[in-house]
Amino acid sequence: MRNPQQRILEAEVELLADTGAIYSIIPSKMLESIKIERRGMRRMRLADGRIIQRHLGIAEIEVRGETAHSNVLFGEDEDTSVLGVTALEELGLQVDHVTGELKPMELLLLSAS
């Protein structure tokens, strides 16, 4: 993971791919260490019905040689670090539900001129 504005600032993080999560959740301390800027807040409903709010930023994410700039949430200590479906799609990856591994996905386009 890198700061898209200052690419020299980077950190390695292990994430669980979570197809039920819209955004990726990264520990706040890690995002702060690479100077990711907070750009607002997002509200989310958890599986147990609770509503939480987290700060949002944009980070450059690299997985298996694929790179994308993606929205990330500043995770708190109790949050699980995950790679959300938005980042997976931006990276052109999907979870193989049989093996649990990441694999390239076929991207859809309605039309092209």
Q: Can you say where each PLM-predicted feature lies in the sequence?
A:
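Pepsin/retropepsin-fold aspartyl endopeptidases
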Residues: 1-113
